[in-house]
Amino acid sequence: MMKMLLGGNETTRKIDSYAINELRIPSIVLMENAAISFTKHIGKNEDNFLIVCGKGNNGGGGYAIARQLFSKDKNVKIFCISDENMSNDCSVNYEICKNSGIEIFYKLEELDKLLLECDVVIEGI
């Protein structure tokens, strides 16, 4: 059985900082690896996803997860909290999602309908 280690926000920040600053792993690579790992644990019966994305690195992770799910032929919709002043990694993943044809919604009035249509909501704020 695989051993899983859990840590809080501060531990995660320290691990990320070490990986980025000492090991020189670009943060976008860490984000992509996290998205790939996350989507490996999605059940086969879940097909309709709503990913709510902010403008920081959590949002970037949400966009990366959206891309991974979309590549597995899942029905993916994104609700974008803001497309202004995004972190660099968030902006990169946002642009890839837009260019890939993933539906992105921006109006709060659309959120109720999106929530009713999905099986799973993923929060990336």
Per-segment meaning from a language model:
Residues 2-7, 46-52, 57-125:
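Glycine-rich phosphate/dinucleotide-binding loop and adjoining beta-alpha-beta core of small-molecule
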Residues 1-47:
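Positively charged, low-complexity intrinsically disordered leader regions
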